[in-house]
Each structure stands twice: as structure tokens, then as C-alpha cells.
Amino acid sequence: MQGLYIKSYGCQMNVYDSLIMENIIKPLGFTVVNEPSEANIVILNTCHIREKASEKLYSELGKMRKIQETKDLTIVVAGCVAQAEGEQIFARAPFVDIVVGPQSIHTLPELIIKARRMKKQVINIDFPIISKFDAIPVEEYTKNQEVSAFISVQEGCNKFCTFCVVPYTRGEEYSRTVEAIFNEALVLSDSGVKEITLIGQNVNAYHGTYKGCEWDLGKLIQYLAKIPNIERIRYTTSHPRDMHQSLYEAHRSETKLMPFVHLPIQSGSDRILKKMNRKHTAEEYIDIINNLRKQRPDIAFSSDFIVGFPGETEEDFEHTMKLVQEVNFSQAYSFKYSPRPGTPSAEYPNQIPEEIKSQRIFRLQELLREQQLAFNRNMIGQTCSVLFNNKKGKFDNQIIGKTEYMQSCYINTDNTNQFYNSILPIKIIDAYQNSVTGIVVN
């Protein structure tokens, strides 16, 4: 058997795609290895959202080249950088053998055979008529899942935010059929999966037709909740413009749907939101938050923020800080704006100096850290439902799980196998910045 090494960058969709690539390549005679030095094929599944992610690729490729100089190694660049840069990757890193876009990964076995037999570079960054989901049997992307699993229900984006490359790298919005999603969930359930996370670039833009009716994400969630062994359902990443009434209703009535929503806003300034082409206001975002809290009072929120968008004034930034204070997030992700080639905002005037970006991101992250720590500390003394999905904690006698609110929860135990793949009531006894600790409630 030859070795296969896959490294994923970025979003959950890339993790999902990496699993697909692993399962369709292994029948060619490969086994997964933990180190690139042990591999005969290395796949770097890339992200293109931020400038540093692209540069990380070329840094990693330099390491792969050194390995390639000592052995027969096929180097594959997959994912969104592959889609965006295409042939430019060969020009910048001529030792790369294969470039494949995220919508063409189902052709990877063919590309590998072609590249290795013909000793030539090959590329496929097409947006094929037949989607990768139609080309790959469901069994190939449900293998090797454990306690929690992703299910891709939607890909692509039609929103065209001015800072974002996703519409150009993932293509237009595409929703899988209800039957395909349900069948995948059934296979996962039969294999022991207890928690599914429905993923998509704009997951709540999901739409389909089934049994003569129109379906959206809320209706899909309530249908999947009927699968007996699936005990938890999550979804990510959502967009404020696609919050439909059925999704509110699902949060109110479906106990399997976890009380946690990742809902990016990017900025609290209406002026900046307009320049970003988000097509919603800060007030509309707050209304969504309040409506979700009305349906599920214990719900927690995370979000994404971009600091230093072109033309952002101090007043604009203060609007963001005000929104953060009003919502009170349990966790959030914040980034300094970095211009992505080919996006409208890369050409905007009034680019913000790095020094100002750094000052603002420090202030924002300080506030977000305060909120996250306060949220975690507020859990002390409460009993949470925790799914233990990781056998390895910081120490040998620990096991890690996730609360309903996506907090990492550690417990001490001499037998990690006893709790693995279990959902247990845990009394929280201590809290930290990024985690909580607890004890099992008898």
C-alpha cells in the first residue's frame, strides 16, 4: 500500500471535501498516513478567504518539495486557491503535479492516474454539469465518520459580498436533493453518528422540491430530526438574508436542533454593510437575533467580523462595538481586512493602514474575549448536555466533549472509552476562556 496524506485549511466544507477525496483515492491502493514524509501522494486542500491562507499554501509547498526531492511524491493542490489561481500555481510552484478545484474533486482518481502514468501536470478547475455529489456514491463520503459528522446540503454563493472570493471559487448556489441528504443521514446514523452538522457556504439558502412541496432549511431540519439515532442537529454557516420563518419555527419546536447559531454580520455599521453589499442593516440583524431568542430563550450566538474594511471610520468601528455589546456573543471570529484579488473591494479607495487595523482588532477581540469568558463562567453550577466526541484531552485522564452551545467541555476519567460517543448530563464546575470543565451527574 502507498501512503496518502491530506491537509485541510479553512472551512468545514474543506474538511468534508477532504473526507470525500480520501475515500475515493484509497481504492487505488492507498492508505492514509499521518506525516507527508510517509506519503506517495500529498493533497493540500486550500482556503482562499484570506491573504495569509494563500501564502500558507506556498510555504507548505516548499516543505513538500524537499520531500519530493528524496522520493517519488505526487503533489496535489485542491480547494479554493486551486480554483482561483489555476495554472498560476504551476508557474509559481512548477513541481506541483495536479491542480483541482472544489467542484471537480470527483475526477481526482482519474487525474492521479493520468499525472503518474504520463508524468505531466494536469488541471481540472471546471464547474461540471454533473455535481460531485451526483458522481460519488453516498457510501464514499460517509465512511470513517465517528460521533459527529458533517453533511453538505448546499454549496456556492449568489450574494457577491464585495470582499469575498467564494462566488468565484465555489460557484453559484446549489442545493442537494432532500432524498440525497436524508439517505446520507441514514447511513451516518446506522454507522453510529449521533450528531450531524448541515453545512454550506450559505446553508440557510437551502431550497429543494420533494413530494410536490417546496423545502427550505427549517423543513429539512424537522425531517432529519425524525431519524431516531440522530440526537443532535446543527447548521453552519448562515446568512442574515436567508432567515426564513420555518427556521425560526424549527428552533422553537425541534429539541434536537441545538441552541447555537453562527450568524456572520461582518460590521455593525450600515454604511460599511452597504459597501460590503451585504443587503441588510444592523437593525435587521438585531431583529433576527431577538426573534431567535424569542423562539429559544437559551440560544447562543457566534459571528464573524471584518475590521478595517476600506473607508471604515472610527464612527463605523464604534457601531460594530455597540452591536457586539448589544448582542452579547458566546464566541466570535474577527479578522483584519485583507484585499482578495478579483474582488471589488480590493480596488476601493481609502484602504485602511495596518496600524489602525491592528488597534481596532485588538479592541474588538478584547471585548469578544470578555463576552466569551463571561458566557462560560455563567455556566458554572448549571448542568449541560455534552456529547463526548474526542478521546484525547489535555491530559491522559481527560476526555473532551461539546456542550449544546459549542463549548469544549473536559471531564476527568480513568476510562475514556466509557464516555466516548455518549451524551451525558455534566455539571459545570469551572470555566476558562475557551472551555469549561465538569463532572458527570449521576
From Swiss-Prot:
It catalyses: N(6)-dimethylallyladenosine(37) in tRNA + (sulfur carrier)-SH + AH2 + 2 S-adenosyl-L-methionine = 2-methylsulfanyl-N(6)-dimethylallyladenosine(37) in tRNA + (sulfur carrier)-H + 5'-deoxyadenosine + L-methionine + A + S-adenosyl-L-homocysteine + 2 H(+). The keyword Phosphoprotein does not apply. The keyword Iron applies. It is found in: Cytoplasm. Disulfide bonds: none annotated. Its main location: cytoplasm. It holds the Pfam family Radical_SAM. This is tRNA-2-methylthio-N(6)-dimethylallyladenosine synthase.
